[in-house]
Regions:
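C-terminal, well-structured catalytic/ligand-binding subdomain of enzymes
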Residues: 2-193
Length: 193
């Protein structure tokens, strides 16, 4: 019942340090932690190699994004809305305190637009069947998300995690063109125990 995900944030070459990159952070936290609180304690002790956002959520609804640089970490808590709470991350830092560390300077494949689409959609469109509504969000039905038509940049996968039921819904590639399929491996492993 723990999800950990990452997004890259551009780092100036001179700021890269010895430490964990975002892929290893995700792997480490998934192997060592069992809750958002536990993952946060571990993450705050790790040396960070380069800029990234780490999204952490657990089956109890505790969720945060940690904006990380080699020199500083900042925790962004979930935003409460009428229909629940949400946390979102894109390929930039969204807190005012951390924006100065983002070397992309806005050249980040429309990160701000994607962030705004998620946050606005949660209050207006994400109701009823949350899995289906989130899939529609990722397909771009509510605004710009993953609709890249550039030959050198495309969506690798889009995933929706149901942490209470341990189910993953994944589109491998552009979710406008690829169907979301159910990945029940985690659910099945837990059921066998």
């Amino acid at each position: 019942g723990l999800a950990v995900a990452m997004t890259f944030v551009m780092t100036s070459l001179e700021n890269i340090q010895a430490g964990f990159n975002s892929f290893f952070i995700v792997r480490y936290l998934l192997e060592k932690a069992n809750s958002t609180e536990n993952a946060l304690l571990l993450l705050m002790k790790l040396p960070i190699a380069s800029n990234c956002n780490i999204l952490i959520a657990d089956k109890n609804g505790e969720m945060v994004v940690v904006e990380c640089t080699p020199y500083e970490k900042r925790i962004r808590k979930a935003v409460s809305m009428d229909n629940g709470k949400i946390v979102c991350t894109v390929n930039s830092f969204t807190s005012d305190e951390m924006k100065q560390h983002d070397a992309a300077k806005g050249n980040d494949y429309h990160s701000a637009k994607r962030y705004d689409t998620v946050m606005e959609s949660f209050s207006t469109h994400i109701k009823g069947n949350l899995i289906e509504a989130t899939e529609q969000l990722l397909k771009g039905d509510y605004g710009f998300m993953c609709q890249y038509d550039e030959p050198d940049f495309e969506t690798v996968w889009s995933s929706v995690f149901d942490l209470k039921n341990l189910m993953i819904y994944r589109a491998e590639g552009d979710p406008r063109k690829k169907k979301f399929v159910v990945d029940s491996r985690l659910h099945d492993v837990v059921q066998r125990k």
